[in-house]
Regions:
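Extreme N-terminal leader/anchor segments
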Residues: 32-33
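N-terminal secretory signal peptides and thylakoid transit peptides that target proteins
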Residues: 1-15
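Boundary of Sec targeting at the N-terminus
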Residues: 27-29
Length: 226
């Protein structure tokens, strides 16, 4: 680990310990040319059947693990989303979309905190929309062209998670660079520092070993939504 990266991670820990107390000026994802194969893959990844979402689990242990996570996250989010049903729907969708894209739910929650402060209809000065501040050009590039759908809960989280996964793949797994690219500030420390710090506040330890459940340690998504 380089000294600069070590300093970044220490700073992220400091942000987490100090708490979050201010608005963030969201950057803007940069529209870049996409190869046809990449565009097709991303379009397929964000495709939505439009059916009502329903979590399904292969084993009872997976369901119990999800319920423990949900029980831990719900109180943490209560001040931001006081209505229980709204809060539960949001967390269920984060859980599914994060793991569908091979991301940690804690990372997605941290990014949402920094990007929008958990405001569904947030709009940045650059025009980014919704919880994960997705730029409208993505709706045209890999979606159906309707940018207003980016305010829909599942659509916004699906686009955001797929885009972050795309950037992680482009950066060969380097989270620091991928987060910077997501914000339009690749190579600069402030934004990744804030997201990494926020992620700390949404981590969940489960099981006898105290391991933090991670999409990276799960070969496939544990649940499906229909």
């Amino acid at each position: 680990m380089t000294p600069a990266r070590r300093a970044l991670l220490l700073a992220a820990g400091g942000v987490a310990l100090g708490g979050w107390s201010g608005a963030v000026r969201a950057g803007s994802q940069v529209e870049e040319p996409l190869a046809d194969s990449v565009r097709s893959a991303l379009s397929a990844a964000v495709a939505d059947s439009g059916a009502p979402p329903k979590l399904e689990f292969r084993h009872i242990d997976e369901r119990l693990a999800f319920l423990r996570w949900l029980g831990a996250m719900s109180p943490r989010l209560a001040k931001r989303k006081p209505e229980f049903n709204v809060r539960r729907e949001f967390l269920e969708t984060v859980w599914y979309e994060a793991r569908r894209a091979g991301l940690e739910p804690a990372l997605v929650l941290g990014l949402v905190e920094v990007e929008s402060g958990f405001r569904k209809y947030a709009i940045s000065s650059a025009g980014a929309r919704g919880y994960m501040q997705v730029m409208p050009f993505w709706a045209r590039t890999i979606g159906d062209g309707d940018a207003s759908r980016l305010f829909h809960l599942q659509t916004n989280l699906r686009f955001g998670c797929v885009i972050l996964r795309h950037y992680l793949d482009r950066e060969r797994g380097d989270l620091f660079l991928a987060l910077g690219r997501y914000n339009g500030s690749r190579g600069q420390a402030p934004y990744p520092t804030m997201v990494l710090g926020a992620r700390r506040r949404w981590e969940f330890k489960d099981g006898p070993t105290g391991a933090v459940p991670s999409a990276a340690t799960t070969p496939s998504a544990p649940a499906s939504r229909r």
